[in-house]
Swiss-Prot record:
UniProt organism field: Roseobacter denitrificans (strain ATCC 33942 / OCh 114)
Protein name: Urease subunit beta
Xref: Pfam families: Urease_beta (PF00699)
Lineage: Bacteria, Pseudomonadati, Pseudomonadota, Alphaproteobacteria, Rhodobacterales
Alphabetically ordered keywords of this record: Cytoplasm, Hydrolase
GO CC, one annotated term: urease complex
EC number: 3.5.1.5
Length: 101
């Protein structure tokens, strides 16, 4: 083994396998771009984003960890959301939950 060497497992890796996804239409009603990261509690995203926040409660974007989705001003797009897993406790963000979901 070489220090820093990556030895990937054979075959394909399926991200978020088994997670029940929902699709929401999101519109950026603001005058600036908005970017939302992979593990951000989507319901608490920037107020300029217009979407069903109740449906997004406890959900995050169904994208690769460490990536983000950018919404340009006036842009509308569908996004897939999956449930936040683990202990399902939310702290920080816009402080709308601050505990168990």
């Amino acid at each position: 083994m070489i220090p820093g060497e990556i030895m990937p497992k054979e075959g394909d890796i399926t991200l978020n396998e088994g997670a029940e996804a929902i699709t929401l239409m999101v519109a950026n009603t603001g005058d600036r771009p908005v970017q939302v990261g992979s593990h951000y509690h989507f319901a608490e995203a920037n107020a300029a984003l217009e979407f069903d926040r109740d449906a997004a409660r406890g959900m995050r974007l169904d994208i690769t960890a460490g990536t983000a989705v950018r919404f340009e001003p006036g842009q509308r797009r569908d996004v897939q959301l999956i449930p936040i897993s683990g202990a399902r406790r939310i702290f920080g963000f816009n402080q709308q939950v601050m505990g168990d979901l």
